[in-house]
């Protein structure tokens, strides 16, 4: 199983039935799988905080949700996480393509890449950083369950080395 297949299968096997996403080159194959899957409702959004809001509404309507995004959008989401998700105890599995840390060629990605883990810690979102597809499959399922139990988001950070398993 390659990197994208592991993420997709773990989402399915976690019982997630509603996904929002923001476009990302690393996540594009996963997003294509989700678009083709009739058992999962996939709603592309234009901004990450919009995804937080849509996932919140879906959760309140009885759905099990996930948000797929690039780490550059984490900063955009902080207010929605603090004022909506934390206050109303909304579990969301957040799968983040972590740019700006390893092998990054776009200098504008580097600051957020360096701050991502600290931001997650500041807003008290637990996170896991799997290195292989098998590890990602297990940790995504664990993170989804933890999110439900905590009634709060849990994140998966997928760095550049992880995505090399798609090649």
From Swiss-Prot:
Gene3D superfamilies registered for this protein in UniProt: 3.40.50.970
Keyword list (alphabetical) reads: Coenzyme M biosynthesis, Decarboxylase, Lyase
Q: Main EC class of this protein?
A: lyase
Enzyme Commission numbers on file: 4.1.1.79
Give the reactions, separated by semicolons, that this protein catalyses: 3-sulfopyruvate + H(+) = sulfoacetaldehyde + CO2
Q: GO terms for molecular function, please?
A: sulfopyruvate decarboxylase activity; thiamine pyrophosphate binding
Keyword Cell cycle in annotation: no
For this entry, list what GO says about its biological process. coenzyme M biosynthetic process
InterPro entries, per this entry?
Answer: Sulfopyruvate_deCO2ase_alpha, THDP-binding, Thiamin_PyroP_enz_TPP-bd_dom, TPP_dependent_decarboxylase
Q: Which pathway does it operate in?
A: Cofactor biosynthesis; coenzyme M biosynthesis; sulfoacetaldehyde from phosphoenolpyruvate and sulfite: step 4/4
- How does the record describe its quaternary structure? Heterododecamer composed of 6 subunits alpha and 6 subunits beta.
What is the annotated role of this protein in its UniProt record?
Involved in the biosynthesis of the coenzyme M (2-mercaptoethanesulfonic acid). Catalyzes the decarboxylation of sulfopyruvate to sulfoacetaldehyde.
> Which family does the record claim for this protein?
Belongs to the ComD family.
Query: Protein name, please?
Result: Sulfopyruvate decarboxylase subunit alpha
